[in-house]
Protein backbone atom coordinates (compact mmCIF):
# COMPACT_ATOMS: atom_id res chain seq x y z
CA UNK A 1 0.00 0.00 0.00
CA UNK A 2 1.34 3.40 -1.00
CA UNK A 3 0.60 6.37 1.24
CA UNK A 4 0.65 9.90 -0.16
CA UNK A 5 -0.47 13.49 0.49
CA UNK A 6 -3.88 14.82 -0.62
CA UNK A 7 -3.89 17.16 -3.60
CA UNK A 8 -5.75 20.45 -2.78
CA UNK A 9 -6.33 20.96 -6.51
CA UNK A 10 -8.13 17.64 -7.00
CA UNK A 11 -11.82 17.75 -8.09
CA UNK A 12 -12.81 16.46 -4.64
CA UNK A 13 -11.53 19.61 -2.94
CA UNK A 14 -12.39 22.18 -5.59
CA UNK A 15 -14.41 25.25 -4.56
CA UNK A 16 -15.29 26.97 -7.82
CA UNK A 17 -17.44 29.72 -6.28
CA UNK A 18 -15.13 30.39 -3.28
CA UNK A 19 -17.94 30.05 -0.73
CA UNK A 20 -15.93 27.61 1.50
CA UNK A 21 -18.16 24.70 0.40
CA UNK A 22 -16.40 22.08 -1.73
CA UNK A 23 -18.00 21.53 -5.14
CA UNK A 24 -18.77 17.88 -4.45
CA UNK A 25 -21.08 18.88 -1.55
CA UNK A 26 -22.13 22.36 -2.72
CA UNK A 27 -25.78 22.58 -3.84
CA UNK A 28 -24.79 25.54 -6.05
CA UNK A 29 -21.16 24.88 -7.01
CA UNK A 30 -20.98 27.80 -9.44
CA UNK A 31 -22.86 30.39 -7.34
CA UNK A 32 -21.61 31.50 -3.93
CA UNK A 33 -24.13 30.46 -1.23
CA UNK A 34 -22.43 29.71 2.05
CA UNK A 35 -25.81 29.23 3.81
CA UNK A 36 -26.78 26.39 1.36
CA UNK A 37 -30.46 27.38 1.67
CA UNK A 38 -32.71 24.99 -0.27
CA UNK A 39 -36.35 25.96 0.32
CA UNK A 40 -37.95 23.18 -1.70
CA UNK A 41 -35.46 20.48 -0.67
CA UNK A 42 -34.72 19.47 -4.23
CA UNK A 43 -30.96 19.42 -3.74
CA UNK A 44 -30.52 22.64 -5.70
CA UNK A 45 -29.76 25.72 -3.59
CA UNK A 46 -32.05 28.74 -3.79
CA UNK A 47 -29.16 30.85 -5.08
CA UNK A 48 -29.14 28.93 -8.37
CA UNK A 49 -32.62 27.37 -8.38
CA UNK A 50 -34.92 29.10 -10.88
CA UNK A 51 -37.93 27.52 -9.14
CA UNK A 52 -37.21 27.73 -5.42
CA UNK A 53 -40.55 26.29 -4.30
CA UNK A 54 -40.61 23.54 -6.98
CA UNK A 55 -44.17 24.36 -8.06
CA UNK A 56 -43.44 24.47 -11.78
CA UNK A 57 -43.50 28.28 -11.91
CA UNK A 58 -40.17 30.02 -12.45
CA UNK A 59 -39.32 32.47 -9.67
CA UNK A 60 -39.34 35.43 -12.04
CA UNK A 61 -43.01 34.73 -12.83
CA UNK A 62 -44.09 33.30 -9.45
CA UNK A 63 -46.24 35.49 -7.17
CA UNK A 64 -44.98 33.42 -4.20
CA UNK A 65 -41.49 32.28 -5.21
CA UNK A 66 -40.75 30.59 -1.87
CA UNK A 67 -44.17 29.00 -1.27
CA UNK A 68 -45.55 26.36 -3.63
CA UNK A 69 -48.72 27.65 -5.31
CA UNK A 70 -49.01 26.25 -8.83
CA UNK A 71 -52.45 27.84 -9.37
CA UNK A 72 -51.11 31.35 -8.54
CA UNK A 73 -54.33 32.44 -6.77
CA UNK A 74 -54.35 36.15 -5.87
CA UNK A 75 -57.77 37.09 -4.46
CA UNK A 76 -57.00 40.75 -3.83
CA UNK A 77 -55.02 41.26 -7.06
CA UNK A 78 -52.08 42.83 -5.22
CA UNK A 79 -49.47 40.79 -7.08
CA UNK A 80 -48.78 38.62 -4.02
CA UNK A 81 -50.21 35.11 -4.12
CA UNK A 82 -52.71 34.01 -1.50
CA UNK A 83 -50.34 31.28 -0.32
CA UNK A 84 -47.86 33.84 1.01
CA UNK A 85 -50.08 36.92 1.41
CA UNK A 86 -50.85 37.74 5.03
CA UNK A 87 -53.48 40.22 3.91
CA UNK A 88 -56.07 38.85 1.54
CA UNK A 89 -58.95 40.93 2.89
CA UNK A 90 -60.99 42.35 0.03
CA UNK A 91 -62.68 45.75 0.17
CA UNK A 92 -66.45 45.83 0.11
CA UNK A 93 -66.16 48.59 -2.46
CA UNK A 94 -62.95 48.77 -4.51
CA UNK A 95 -62.19 52.00 -6.30
CA UNK A 96 -63.15 51.20 -9.89
CA UNK A 97 -63.49 53.74 -12.67
CA UNK A 98 -63.20 56.56 -10.16
CA UNK A 99 -65.97 55.39 -7.81
CA UNK A 100 -66.26 53.24 -4.68
CA UNK A 101 -69.95 52.59 -3.96
CA UNK A 102 -70.75 55.97 -5.48
CA UNK A 103 -67.97 57.82 -3.65
CA UNK A 104 -65.48 59.58 -5.95
CA UNK A 105 -62.06 58.03 -5.40
CA UNK A 106 -58.53 57.69 -6.67
CA UNK A 107 -55.99 55.33 -5.16
CA UNK A 108 -58.12 54.31 -2.17
CA UNK A 109 -60.61 51.49 -1.69
CA UNK A 110 -63.59 51.70 0.65
CA UNK A 111 -63.18 48.68 2.90
CA UNK A 112 -66.46 49.31 4.71
CA UNK A 113 -68.80 51.97 6.06
CA UNK A 114 -70.84 52.22 9.27
CA UNK A 115 -73.70 54.77 9.12
CA UNK A 116 -73.76 57.44 11.81
CA UNK A 117 -77.10 56.23 13.20
CA UNK A 118 -75.55 52.83 13.98
CA UNK A 119 -72.82 54.53 15.99
CA UNK A 120 -74.61 57.35 17.79
CA UNK A 121 -78.31 56.71 17.34
CA UNK A 122 -80.99 58.50 15.36
CA UNK A 123 -80.20 62.16 14.76
CA UNK A 124 -76.55 61.86 15.81
CA UNK A 125 -73.69 63.51 13.94
CA UNK A 126 -70.07 62.40 13.74
CA UNK A 127 -66.99 64.33 14.79
CA UNK A 128 -63.56 63.23 15.99
CA UNK A 129 -61.88 59.82 15.78
CA UNK A 130 -58.72 58.03 16.85
CA UNK A 131 -57.35 54.50 16.83
CA UNK A 132 -56.00 51.87 19.21
CA UNK A 133 -54.15 48.63 18.54
CA UNK A 134 -54.44 46.07 21.33
CA UNK A 135 -50.82 45.18 22.17
CA UNK A 136 -51.88 41.72 23.35
CA UNK A 137 -54.10 40.60 20.46
CA UNK A 138 -53.01 42.93 17.65
CA UNK A 139 -56.66 43.82 17.00
CA UNK A 140 -57.18 47.34 15.67
CA UNK A 141 -60.04 49.41 17.00
CA UNK A 142 -61.62 52.59 15.69
CA UNK A 143 -62.69 55.11 18.33
CA UNK A 144 -65.43 57.23 16.78
CA UNK A 145 -66.93 60.25 18.51
CA UNK A 146 -70.48 61.39 17.90
CA UNK A 147 -72.76 64.03 19.37
CA UNK A 148 -74.05 61.44 21.87
CA UNK A 149 -71.20 59.08 22.67
CA UNK A 150 -67.87 57.49 21.81
CA UNK A 151 -68.15 54.23 19.85
CA UNK A 152 -65.55 51.46 19.84
CA UNK A 153 -65.31 49.40 16.64
CA UNK A 154 -63.29 46.22 16.04
CA UNK A 155 -61.74 46.54 12.58
CA UNK A 156 -59.57 43.41 12.64
CA UNK A 157 -61.53 42.56 9.50
CA UNK A 158 -61.89 46.04 8.01
CA UNK A 159 -64.45 44.78 5.52
CA UNK A 160 -66.67 43.53 8.34
CA UNK A 161 -66.26 45.89 11.31
CA UNK A 162 -68.02 45.16 14.59
CA UNK A 163 -69.33 47.83 16.97
CA UNK A 164 -68.09 46.46 20.30
CA UNK A 165 -69.74 49.09 22.47
CA UNK A 166 -70.28 52.75 23.28
CA UNK A 167 -69.41 55.17 26.08
CA UNK A 168 -72.25 57.72 26.45
CA UNK A 169 -71.53 61.41 26.94
CA UNK A 170 -70.83 62.35 30.56
CA UNK A 171 -73.48 65.08 30.53
CA UNK A 172 -75.29 66.50 27.49
CA UNK A 173 -75.00 65.90 23.77
CA UNK A 174 -72.57 68.13 21.87
CA UNK A 175 -71.34 68.59 18.28
CA UNK A 176 -67.78 68.67 19.70
CA UNK A 177 -66.27 65.56 21.25
CA UNK A 178 -62.62 64.56 21.03
CA UNK A 179 -60.66 61.44 21.96
CA UNK A 180 -57.00 60.43 22.23
CA UNK A 181 -55.24 57.31 23.54
CA UNK A 182 -52.46 56.71 26.06
CA UNK A 183 -51.31 53.50 27.75
CA UNK A 184 -54.33 51.47 26.58
CA UNK A 185 -56.82 54.06 27.84
CA UNK A 186 -59.06 56.45 25.93
CA UNK A 187 -59.41 60.05 27.12
CA UNK A 188 -62.56 61.84 25.99
CA UNK A 189 -63.49 65.53 26.29
CA UNK A 190 -66.43 67.50 24.97
CA UNK A 191 -67.83 71.00 24.83
CA UNK A 192 -70.89 69.67 26.67
CA UNK A 193 -71.18 71.72 29.90
CA UNK A 194 -69.59 70.05 32.91
CA UNK A 195 -68.37 67.07 30.88
CA UNK A 196 -64.79 66.96 32.14
CA UNK A 197 -62.50 64.19 30.87
CA UNK A 198 -63.71 60.60 30.71
CA UNK A 199 -61.10 57.84 31.06
CA UNK A 200 -61.90 54.42 29.63
CA UNK A 201 -59.78 51.26 29.91
CA UNK A 202 -59.64 49.95 26.36
CA UNK A 203 -58.55 46.47 27.44
CA UNK A 204 -62.17 45.95 28.55
CA UNK A 205 -63.01 45.55 24.86
CA UNK A 206 -61.29 42.14 24.90
CA UNK A 207 -63.91 40.61 27.17
CA UNK A 208 -67.04 41.72 25.31
CA UNK A 209 -69.03 38.64 24.30
CA UNK A 210 -72.36 40.16 23.31
CA UNK A 211 -71.70 43.39 21.42
CA UNK A 212 -72.55 46.17 21.46
CA UNK A 213 -72.24 46.94 25.17
CA UNK A 214 -72.93 50.27 26.85
CA UNK A 215 -69.94 51.19 29.01
CA UNK A 216 -69.31 53.50 31.93
CA UNK A 217 -66.06 55.42 32.37
CA UNK A 218 -63.31 54.01 34.59
CA UNK A 219 -62.47 57.50 35.84
CA UNK A 220 -63.56 61.09 35.41
CA UNK A 221 -61.40 64.20 35.67
CA UNK A 222 -63.27 67.35 36.64
CA UNK A 223 -60.48 69.93 36.69
CA UNK A 224 -62.31 71.59 33.80
CA UNK A 225 -65.88 71.37 32.58
CA UNK A 226 -66.01 71.75 28.82
CA UNK A 227 -63.07 71.46 26.43
CA UNK A 228 -62.86 71.58 22.67
CA UNK A 229 -60.03 69.13 22.22
CA UNK A 230 -57.48 66.97 23.96
CA UNK A 231 -53.84 66.42 23.02
CA UNK A 232 -51.53 63.78 24.50
CA UNK A 233 -47.76 63.45 24.43
CA UNK A 234 -47.37 59.69 24.83
CA UNK A 235 -43.65 60.04 25.59
CA UNK A 236 -44.23 62.19 28.67
CA UNK A 237 -47.60 60.90 29.85
CA UNK A 238 -49.22 64.33 29.92
CA UNK A 239 -52.54 65.35 28.42
CA UNK A 240 -53.36 68.89 27.32
CA UNK A 241 -57.00 69.93 27.16
CA UNK A 242 -57.40 72.93 24.86
CA UNK A 243 -60.30 75.30 24.42
CA UNK A 244 -61.47 74.51 27.94
CA UNK A 245 -63.24 76.78 30.40
CA UNK A 246 -59.95 77.24 32.30
CA UNK A 247 -56.73 79.17 31.55
CA UNK A 248 -58.55 81.48 29.13
CA UNK A 249 -59.00 78.54 26.79
CA UNK A 250 -55.27 77.84 26.75
CA UNK A 251 -53.84 74.37 27.37
CA UNK A 252 -54.79 72.74 30.67
CA UNK A 253 -52.08 70.28 31.76
CA UNK A 254 -53.01 66.87 33.23
CA UNK A 255 -50.62 64.16 34.42
CA UNK A 256 -52.08 60.87 33.12
CA UNK A 257 -49.11 58.61 33.81
CA UNK A 258 -51.51 56.66 36.02
CA UNK A 259 -54.42 56.82 33.57
CA UNK A 260 -57.26 56.24 36.02
CA UNK A 261 -55.87 58.75 38.53
CA UNK A 262 -55.31 61.92 36.47
CA UNK A 263 -53.71 64.82 38.32
CA UNK A 264 -53.97 68.54 37.52
CA UNK A 265 -50.55 69.88 36.55
CA UNK A 266 -51.12 73.54 35.67
CA UNK A 267 -51.80 75.35 32.44
CA UNK A 268 -50.87 78.16 30.07
CA UNK A 269 -53.05 81.24 29.68
CA UNK A 270 -50.71 83.79 28.10
CA UNK A 271 -51.83 83.54 24.47
CA UNK A 272 -55.12 83.39 22.59
CA UNK A 273 -57.69 80.63 22.97
CA UNK A 274 -56.13 77.38 21.76
CA UNK A 275 -58.29 75.45 19.33
CA UNK A 276 -55.93 72.52 18.84
CA UNK A 277 -52.30 71.63 19.46
CA UNK A 278 -49.55 69.10 18.96
CA UNK A 279 -47.18 68.36 21.84
CA UNK A 280 -43.92 66.51 21.24
CA UNK A 281 -40.74 65.60 23.02
CA UNK A 282 -38.61 67.57 20.61
CA UNK A 283 -36.05 65.77 18.44
CA UNK A 284 -35.77 68.16 15.51
CA UNK A 285 -33.06 70.34 13.96
CA UNK A 286 -33.02 73.07 16.65
CA UNK A 287 -30.34 71.86 19.08
CA UNK A 288 -31.46 74.36 21.72
CA UNK A 289 -34.62 72.36 22.40
CA UNK A 290 -33.61 68.72 22.01
CA UNK A 291 -35.40 66.68 24.67
CA UNK A 292 -37.69 69.54 25.67
CA UNK A 293 -41.47 69.15 25.66
CA UNK A 294 -42.74 71.55 23.00
CA UNK A 295 -46.35 72.57 22.36
CA UNK A 296 -47.43 73.96 18.99
CA UNK A 297 -50.77 75.68 19.46
CA UNK A 298 -53.18 76.55 16.66
CA UNK A 299 -54.68 79.57 18.39
CA UNK A 300 -57.26 81.15 16.10
CA UNK A 301 -55.20 84.22 15.08
CA UNK A 302 -51.67 82.81 15.37
CA UNK A 303 -49.54 79.73 15.81
CA UNK A 304 -47.70 79.70 19.13
CA UNK A 305 -44.66 77.63 20.16
CA UNK A 306 -44.35 77.02 23.91
CA UNK A 307 -41.83 75.10 26.01
CA UNK A 308 -44.01 73.18 28.48
CA UNK A 309 -41.27 71.01 29.99
CA UNK A 310 -41.69 72.72 33.36
CA UNK A 311 -45.42 72.55 33.93
CA UNK A 312 -45.17 75.21 36.64
CA UNK A 313 -43.39 77.63 34.32
CA UNK A 314 -44.32 77.22 30.63
CA UNK A 315 -42.36 79.61 28.42
CA UNK A 316 -43.43 81.05 25.09
CA UNK A 317 -40.70 80.52 22.49
CA UNK A 318 -42.28 82.35 19.53
CA UNK A 319 -45.44 83.04 17.55
CA UNK A 320 -46.15 83.36 13.85
CA UNK A 321 -49.07 84.38 11.66
CA UNK A 322 -49.54 84.41 7.89
CA UNK A 323 -51.35 86.06 5.01
CA UNK A 324 -55.10 85.59 4.46
CA UNK A 325 -55.47 84.45 8.05
CA UNK A 326 -58.98 83.27 8.79
CA UNK A 327 -58.83 80.82 11.71
CA UNK A 328 -55.64 78.94 12.63
CA UNK A 329 -57.25 75.58 13.29
CA UNK A 330 -54.93 72.55 13.48
CA UNK A 331 -51.49 71.46 12.35
CA UNK A 332 -48.91 68.68 12.42
CA UNK A 333 -45.12 68.34 12.27
CA UNK A 334 -43.36 66.45 9.50
CA UNK A 335 -41.56 63.40 10.87
CA UNK A 336 -38.22 65.22 10.96
CA UNK A 337 -39.81 68.21 12.74
CA UNK A 338 -38.47 70.61 10.12
CA UNK A 339 -41.87 71.68 8.79
CA UNK A 340 -45.26 72.30 10.38
CA UNK A 341 -48.36 71.95 8.18
CA UNK A 342 -51.30 74.09 9.27
CA UNK A 343 -54.94 74.11 8.28
CA UNK A 344 -56.95 77.34 8.42
CA UNK A 345 -60.63 76.49 8.81
CA UNK A 346 -62.27 79.57 7.30
CA UNK A 347 -59.83 80.96 4.72
CA UNK A 348 -61.77 79.18 1.98
CA UNK A 349 -64.91 81.00 3.16
CA UNK A 350 -63.37 84.41 3.83
CA UNK A 351 -61.04 84.67 0.84
CA UNK A 352 -62.55 82.37 -1.79
CA UNK A 353 -59.53 80.05 -1.81
CA UNK A 354 -59.38 76.40 -2.70
CA UNK A 355 -58.50 74.02 0.16
CA UNK A 356 -55.32 75.53 1.57
CA UNK A 357 -52.51 74.15 3.72
CA UNK A 358 -49.91 76.58 5.06
CA UNK A 359 -46.39 75.25 5.63
CA UNK A 360 -43.93 76.78 8.08
CA UNK A 361 -40.22 76.05 8.46
CA UNK A 362 -39.63 75.33 12.15
CA UNK A 363 -35.91 74.55 11.89
CA UNK A 364 -35.32 77.41 14.33
CA UNK A 365 -38.11 77.39 16.90
CA UNK A 366 -37.19 80.88 18.03
CA UNK A 367 -37.58 82.19 14.50
CA UNK A 368 -40.25 80.22 12.61
CA UNK A 369 -40.69 81.16 8.96
CA UNK A 370 -43.43 80.89 6.36
CA UNK A 371 -42.33 78.33 3.76
CA UNK A 372 -45.14 77.79 1.24
CA UNK A 373 -48.81 77.09 0.81
CA UNK A 374 -50.65 74.36 -1.05
CA UNK A 375 -54.00 74.81 -2.78
CA UNK A 376 -56.05 71.69 -3.44
CA UNK A 377 -58.27 70.96 -6.45
CA UNK A 378 -61.58 71.76 -4.70
CA UNK A 379 -63.03 74.61 -2.66
CA UNK A 380 -63.79 72.32 0.30
CA UNK A 381 -62.74 73.49 3.77
CA UNK A 382 -59.71 71.68 5.17
CA UNK A 383 -60.11 70.42 8.73
CA UNK A 384 -57.75 67.98 10.50
CA UNK A 385 -54.53 66.73 8.91
CA UNK A 386 -51.73 64.34 9.92
CA UNK A 387 -48.34 63.36 8.50
CA UNK A 388 -47.15 59.79 8.03
CA UNK A 389 -43.78 59.60 6.31
CA UNK A 390 -44.01 61.52 3.05
CA UNK A 391 -47.80 61.69 2.98
CA UNK A 392 -50.07 64.35 4.46
CA UNK A 393 -53.57 63.00 5.07
CA UNK A 394 -56.26 65.67 5.38
CA UNK A 395 -59.97 65.62 6.14
CA UNK A 396 -61.33 68.17 3.69
CA UNK A 397 -64.95 68.22 4.83
CA UNK A 398 -67.11 67.91 1.67
CA UNK A 399 -64.16 66.57 -0.39
CA UNK A 400 -63.37 63.77 2.07
CA UNK A 401 -59.97 62.19 2.58
CA UNK A 402 -57.15 63.72 0.55
CA UNK A 403 -53.62 62.28 0.43
CA UNK A 404 -50.83 64.70 -0.48
CA UNK A 405 -47.23 63.78 -1.31
CA UNK A 406 -44.85 66.02 0.68
CA UNK A 407 -41.57 64.35 -0.31
CA UNK A 408 -40.52 67.53 -2.15
CA UNK A 409 -41.39 70.07 0.54
CA UNK A 410 -37.82 71.38 0.46
CA UNK A 411 -38.46 72.44 -3.13
CA UNK A 412 -41.86 73.92 -2.33
CA UNK A 413 -43.83 71.13 -4.02
CA UNK A 414 -46.89 69.27 -2.67
CA UNK A 415 -48.89 66.96 -4.93
CA UNK A 416 -52.22 65.25 -4.34
CA UNK A 417 -51.78 61.51 -4.93
CA UNK A 418 -55.15 60.09 -3.91
CA UNK A 419 -58.54 60.68 -2.35
CA UNK A 420 -61.80 59.11 -1.25
CA UNK A 421 -64.71 61.53 -1.00
CA UNK A 422 -66.98 60.55 1.89
CA UNK A 423 -69.56 63.26 1.10
CA UNK A 424 -71.15 62.46 -2.26
CA UNK A 425 -73.46 65.45 -2.93
CA UNK A 426 -70.79 68.09 -3.62
CA UNK A 427 -67.39 69.58 -2.76
CA UNK A 428 -68.80 72.93 -1.67
CA UNK A 429 -67.30 75.26 0.92
CA UNK A 430 -69.48 73.97 3.76
CA UNK A 431 -69.30 72.20 7.11
CA UNK A 432 -70.37 68.75 5.97
CA UNK A 433 -68.44 65.57 5.41
CA UNK A 434 -65.06 64.40 6.71
CA UNK A 435 -64.10 65.73 10.16
CA UNK A 436 -61.03 63.66 10.96
CA UNK A 437 -58.53 61.15 9.59
CA UNK A 438 -56.62 58.49 11.55
CA UNK A 439 -53.79 57.19 9.31
CA UNK A 440 -51.48 55.60 11.92
CA UNK A 441 -52.44 51.89 11.88
CA UNK A 442 -49.59 49.59 10.83
CA UNK A 443 -52.02 47.53 8.73
CA UNK A 444 -52.65 50.43 6.38
CA UNK A 445 -56.26 50.85 7.49
CA UNK A 446 -57.26 54.52 7.55
CA UNK A 447 -60.23 55.85 9.49
CA UNK A 448 -62.36 58.73 8.25
CA UNK A 449 -64.98 60.08 10.63
CA UNK A 450 -67.71 61.92 8.78
CA UNK A 451 -70.26 64.35 10.24
CA UNK A 452 -73.09 63.09 8.08
CA UNK A 453 -71.96 59.63 7.02
CA UNK A 454 -70.39 58.02 10.09
CA UNK A 455 -67.26 55.86 9.96
CA UNK A 456 -65.44 55.03 6.73
CA UNK A 457 -62.58 52.51 6.73
CA UNK A 458 -60.33 52.87 3.70
CA UNK A 459 -57.05 51.50 2.42
CA UNK A 460 -54.71 52.38 -0.42
CA UNK A 461 -55.69 50.48 -3.56
CA UNK A 462 -53.38 47.64 -4.57
Spans of model-derived segments:
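Feature marking well-ordered beta-strand scaffolds used for ligand recognition
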Residues: 86-462
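Extracellular calcium-associated, cysteine-rich motifs in secreted modular proteins
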Residues: 8-90, 94, 102
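C-terminal motif of bacterial Sec signal peptides marking the signal peptidase cleavage site
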Residues: 3-4
Amino acid sequence: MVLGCSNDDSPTNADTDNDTIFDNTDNCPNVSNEDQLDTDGDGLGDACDEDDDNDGILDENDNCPLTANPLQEDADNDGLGDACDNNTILPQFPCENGLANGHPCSGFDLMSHIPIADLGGAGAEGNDSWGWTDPQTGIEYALMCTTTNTAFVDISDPSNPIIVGTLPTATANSPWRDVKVYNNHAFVVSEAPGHGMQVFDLTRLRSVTNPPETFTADANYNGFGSAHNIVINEESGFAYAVGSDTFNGGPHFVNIQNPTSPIAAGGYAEDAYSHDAQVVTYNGPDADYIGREILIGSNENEVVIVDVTDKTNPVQISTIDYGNLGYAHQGWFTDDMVYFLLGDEVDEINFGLNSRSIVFNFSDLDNPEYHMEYLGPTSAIDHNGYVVGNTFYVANYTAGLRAIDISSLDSGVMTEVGYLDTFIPNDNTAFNGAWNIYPFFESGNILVSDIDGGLFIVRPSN
